Amino acid sequence: QKPGENSGLAAEIKKHVKTPVVTVGAFSEPDKMEAFLEESGVDCIAMGRALIADPFLPRKIMRGKVADITPCLRCGECQSGMMRNKTMRCAVNPYIGREAEYFHPIPTREHKNLLVVGGGPAGMQAAITACERGHKVTLVEKSDRLGGLKYADNADFKANIRRYRDMTAAKVMALPVDVRLNTVVTDELVAEVKPDAIIACVGADPWALPVPGASGENVVFGAELKRADPRVGHKVVVIGGGLIGCEEGIELAKEGHEVTILEMQEELCPDCGRMHRLSVLHEIEVAETLHTATGFRCTGIDAEGVSAVDAEGKEVRFPADTVVMCAGMRPRSTEVERLSKYCTEFYVCGDATRARQIGQATRDGYDAVVNVGL
């Protein structure tokens, strides 16, 4: 959904009626809301999901603290949670559905020295929650920036995720957190920091299917693709029809590639919320150069394409210039095991446990800090 999806309709209605007109639809950026109200003459903007992501959004706007707003991702996690188990959840607000913990927080028995390893969504949330609870925090990130979520740079429809990532990273940098970029955890660093607890948010690596040709020159990982990536030829086969595979397929089709999504199961995108899945399936349906093949198991890759078998064992060929591997993520278990030797109070969050979406990662980071010292 585009920001202000219904704004044009509301502005036109306002021209013909004297009664107040209210519009709604993916509004969350204060400057754009103010500009729309001024230009259109519409009387009011209503917000729903933006206030789930940040219930204090109006107060922050009034006080000029726009940079502190937690932006809504428009991911539908709030709606999907209600449909799934009748409990509302939010990808960026770990308190939603657990409001009693916000107004009556579990007390911190003792302020401790925490070492958070990894600056993705789980690590950033852990650092924010730790500061709120009065702990001393050192956040170590091996790359040159906080935020993770590099795949969000690959597609226009990931703009909300990029905004969340960048604003959350800025929020962490503004807190009394000792942030160390381009840094790995060593014996010397642990001896210097002397952590009482370690929270490992070290993420996961893309996993390649164990089939012949999986390491060929025409194979790239979906999580590592860049926008208009020059490595991608015209005809593309995406191996894996989960959320990442489907979204990569959609974006590649929009760039003009001929794309086939190859999935072993009978349905696509089973790993995302119901509302988001409906949107993804709709995008696949309307994309003219995007095709799907479910119920096929990849058996090999070569320079001409992909070999697969159907449920009956019949072999089928899918020609391709480029194969995009979206077969899943593998937690960095070796790194987790290495870090666990440094501290007896040790927590693992986010993709380092298993493949996670943003909402699960932020809740992991929050929960780990709340459990420190209990």
What are these regions (language model features)?
Residues 12, 35-36, 60, 171, ...:
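Well-formed, non-transmembrane alpha-helical positions, independent of function
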Residues 42, 172, 195-196, 320-321:
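Local beta-strand N-terminus motif with an aromatic residue
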Residues 1-117, 121, 125-132, 136-137, ...:
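Flavin-dependent oxidoreductase catalytic cores
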Residues 1-3, 40, 62-65, 155-159, ...:
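Short, hinge-like loop/turn segments at secondary-structure boundaries
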Residues 139-175, 227, 251-296, 353:
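Rossmann-like dinucleotide-binding cores of NAD(P)H-dependent redox enzymes
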Residues 73-86, 195-206, 210-211:
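Helix-enriched interaction subdomains in cytosolic or periplasmic regions
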Residues 31, 37, 108-140, 180-194, ...:
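Rossmann-like dinucleotide/flavin-binding elements
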Residues 41, 172-178, 215-218, 284-291, ...:
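A short helix-to-beta-strand connector/capping loop
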